[in-house]
UniProtKB/Swiss-Prot annotation:
Self-association and partners: Homodimer and heterodimers.
Family: Belongs to the Casparian strip membrane proteins (CASP) family.
Keywords: Cell membrane, Membrane, Transmembrane, Transmembrane helix
Cytoplasmic side: 1-4, 74-80, 154-178
Subcellular location: Cell membrane
Domain of life: Eukaryota
Assigned GO CC terms: plasma membrane
Topology Extracellular: residue spans: 26-52, 102-132
Protein name: CASP-like protein 2U3
Membrane topology according to the record: Multi-pass membrane protein
Keyword Nucleus on entry: no
Bilayer-spanning residue ranges: 5-25, 53-73, 81-101, 133-153
Chief location of this protein within or outside the cell: membrane
Organism of origin: Pteridium aquilinum subsp. aquilinum
Length: 178
């Protein structure tokens, strides 16, 4: 019972982290002006301008929906087939979210530092608020990845462990006096 509660709490935590990561990124935008001589030129930053950030929003949304469904399934059914499915899906979605977070981290790094070999300048000096919120979204997403990895480990131990994780404790036989 305690393991089931822990699993549900971890899945709820993954839901909350993924929703927060998606919302922070999806709402992230900033408008600014730079001066070219005496002419102010407007600049705009939106998450939708960068494919990796769009991927991050969708991946977080998919993980949140999956974890919600997994909570319902784990509360309603107990079977080895379901345990195997959750084990597989926990890993698959951890990899999906890790890929989205890694791609977005690379874009954020280039935005912060630039890429000298390609003569790309950094942009975060003009969009500090935008870049800070990208960082917040990435932290939330990587935390969600860690929760999913933990769930995959727990699912694997439950499925393949000897003795199985969360198995009911065996009670020693009661000896009756002769």
């Amino acid at each position: 019972m305690a393991c089931r509660v822990m699993e549900v709490l971890l899945r709820v935590l993954a839901i909350l982290l993924s929703i927060a990561g998606a919302l922070v990124m999806a709402k992230d935008k900033q408008d600014t002006f730079v001066m070219l001589g005496t002419v102010p030129v407007p600049l705009y930053a939106r998450h939708s301008y960068v494919e990796a950030f769009v991927f991050l929003v969708y991946a977080n949304g998919i993980v949140a929906i999956y974890c919600f469904i997994a909570v319902l399934l784990s509360l309603l059914a107990k079977s080895r087939v379901l345990a195997g499915l959750l084990f597989f899906m926990d890993q698959a979605l951890a990899y999906l979210l890790l890929a989205a977070a890694a791609a977005s981290t690379e874009v954020a790094y280039i935005a912060k530092r630039g890429e000298k070999k390609l003569v790309w300048g950094e942009v975060c000096s003009n969009f500090e608020h935008f870049c800070n919120l990208v960082g917040v979204s990435l932290v939330l997403t990587f935390l969600s990845v860690l929760v999913l990895v933990t769930l995959a480990i727990l699912s694997g131990k439950r499925l393949f462990g000897h003795p199985p994780l969360c198995a009911p404790p065996s009670t020693p036989p009661v000896h009756q006096g002769v």
